[in-house]
Amino acid sequence: MALSPEELSTESLAEIFAAGGRPADSEREIKIIDTTLRDAHQSIWATRMRTEHIMDLLDDVTNAGFEHVDLVAPIQFDVPVRYLREDPWERVRKVHEAAPNTKFRSMVRSRNLASFDFLPDDVIHAWVERLYANGFRVIGAFDGLNDIDNIADTLILAKELGAETYGCLSYCLSPVHTDQLYIDKAQELVERTDVDRIMLKDAGGLLTPDRMKTLIPAIRSAIGNDLPLEVHTHSLTGLSPLTYIYAAELGVDSIHTSIAP
């Protein structure tokens, strides 16, 4: 059972662990979404993992019990063509053929895809249709400015095709990025796209345990208790393990992890 912010403010994690942890009836399963094949090499190797590298790792990754395996965002289509001289769609097909029972994820970036231009609706729609046709059954979308107009069509179409969908809330530190902003954006995502789950996306590694104390309950209040909520962060400050512990205490359902390539 998730703690309220008031409970967290009066009971530290050290006190919880010293007492032997939570009572048995408060235990929850926290699921793991692996990002080794997508974000790990994107962040450390500039997305230079080749198809042969992925295929070598595939058995271990797909048999580890992860809820989903993150495989591509638009940059995983750009780099193979530009630098590796590989066909990214062929990579996607090979991976799905080798592990047909694994839920691989794809993510769509705003209205840009793999470019820096705003693309027309028919191009966005064709991209989403090709993702689904090539095996993806979990499709999400994000916009760096949390402009839901830029991702709503993607999520609606993906769901119409039969995919499980996730909408991202991009995290940032600024006077604008208040709890209320995330409440408003989460509600808009759910109301406009009927999304299947929400991801708090912290690509900059800026989340802290203290920030989670109000942010996660705020988002949860907006989306209800039944819609899965996941957190994606990076360990640039070294705080991500503790941030994830607080996320679990506060009611997050899934966390994103990876290993170095």
Regions found by a protein language model. Give the residues of each.
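Catalytic alpha/beta core domains of metabolic enzymes, predominantly
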Residues: 203-261
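Secondary-structure transition/capping motifs at alpha-helix termini
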Residues: 100-102, 160-164, 191-196, 220-227, ...
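Hydrophobic faces of well-ordered beta-strands that scaffold small-molecule active sites
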Residues: 31-39, 67-71, 102-109, 137-141, ...
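Generic hydrophobic/aromatic pocket-lining and core-packing "Φ" positions
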Residues: 58, 92, 128, 155, ...
